[in-house]
Amino acid sequence: MKTGTLPAYIIAWLHLVGLDMPQLSELYRIDNFIDTFALGHYARVLAAADLRSGNTVAFKVMRPEHLDSNGDMRWEYRAFGNEAEILARLRHSPNIVKFYDFGFISDREEAPRNGEIISYQSDVRGFLEALSRYAAAGWRPYLTMENLPRSHSLFYLMKPNSPNSRWRLPSEEGLALALQFSSLLSLAHGMQIVYLDHKLEHVYWDGVHLKVIDFNSSRRLENDRRQSPQQYTKDVHNMCVGVLYSLFTGMSPQKTSLRPQPSSREAVEARYTDIDNLDFSMEPSLSEGIAELLQRGAAENITTVQEFINGLQRVATQHGWQFSDYLTSPASSQAREQMRAGLQRLRQGQEHVREARDLFREALIQDGISRDLEDELRRLVVVLNEMLNNRVVP
């Protein structure tokens, strides 16, 4: 039996008595970085193949600069334990990224390739108990999770590629995303967990389903009853300001074009504290009901996520949605179904346009093509880029 297939507690014992440990390359094939469009403070993320399961995964490993020379656990080290515990508690939600494995590696290179590894897989308790031991040894924590397509990252999709470009989600999709996100917060708050780190970089959306990543900065409040109500209100505030405002307007809450938000512990705490008024002047077509609801959240006039959900459902009925407590007209309901079908076809059409453009680009780099054919291919690429720059759905 290979050491990489042994239980983590046996491998840990092997480590303690000085026997051979499994190598990183026995468990994972590490590929390229996949976080370059939105770098984080705590960790780097690489594509990897789990050689035990055959799954393609995202391999998230703590940045080497967060190792302490004295073997102490800095906040960034503890954050991996915090994330592991919260992911385990929320694992039944369809809206969080799936996790597969937690563990530690000895390689201190930013992009690890070699060295030893201890894998706890889904044994979160064992991983948490081992944190201090492997911090003292100078090993870095890692976790693996499902590798979500970059094409589903809202920040990647909505980030402008020219000074005058800006995209927003259609209101139908924005409402669907907001309902799923607030449902996730409702589940988390029921477990005394606040997410806090709301930004587009952490939001993945395929037009139907929401996935949220990065729970490093999330917090459990079980020993802080006095502050809990304020923290729940702040979580709703951060969702309205940091995610929903941007996806409905295509703008940063700092009243600039979209840009990466700072991600250190201190930055997460302070990121939106001074934002209590949202500017919707650049998106006059946005429903007044949506704008008013988000403004109430920004002003912290919504104290619980359930209050936000109730308000969101009332607003959504004006867009053809139907709920047990809030009704819409039959005509609006039918029109919404037609709009949903149209948006689905629109997404498919835009994807076909991208595929056509990429085929033309590949043809352009062929050696020996005629000048006339080259000119026509360039013309088509330019026209399709213009179509995509003016697309309806990010």
Please state what every model-predicted region is:
Residues 202-214:
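Conserved protein kinase catalytic/activation segment
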Residues 177-178:
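Activation segment signature within eukaryotic-like protein kinase domains
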Residues 100-168:
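Conserved structural core of kinase catalytic domains
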Residues 42-88, 96-97, 101, 105-111:
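ATP-binding glycine-rich loop module of kinase domains
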Residues 211, 215-286:
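C-lobe/activation-segment region of protein kinase-like
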Residues 1-35:
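Juxta-kinase regulatory segment immediately upstream of eukaryotic protein kinase catalytic domains
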Residues 298-322:
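Terminal C-lobe "cap" of eukaryotic-type protein kinase domains
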Residues 188-205:
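Catalytic-loop of the protein kinase fold
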